[in-house]
């Protein structure tokens, strides 16, 4: 979210990846490993192709746009697993945001107890994220929340968990 600084959703990843490539390829005229991998994955032949790809990426709901978004998100997590420093910086921003958001929710909802169960959900966490990213997130949560949380991956849709919680 542009206002709150919330980082980590699929659109956010796509925009940040595009911005990093734009910064390096267009503004600095530098072919970093991220630029080379992005251009290859997106099948772009020139700087003009890259700039023109923006309209395909921002188109939102059409099938081609969704395919391109998935491709960039997959590339993001692949590069993270290969320790790409530019992607690592973005992942750190995402992790920090997620960990502080979860900590704030625990505090605001007045959850108490020795161990508070937290179920991670959302398509990025449950479908796209790499095991390395999830480990980094769990480690950040452990530090920020001082080990109070018992972190699990949501195996079902989040709404099913909410209904189950209400039923008791």
Annotate each language-model stretch with its function.
Residues 18-168:
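ATP-binding/phosphotransfer module of carbohydrate and carboxylate kinases, centering on a glycine-rich
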Residues 1-25, 29:
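Glycine-rich phosphate-binding loop of actin/hexokinase-like ATP-binding domains
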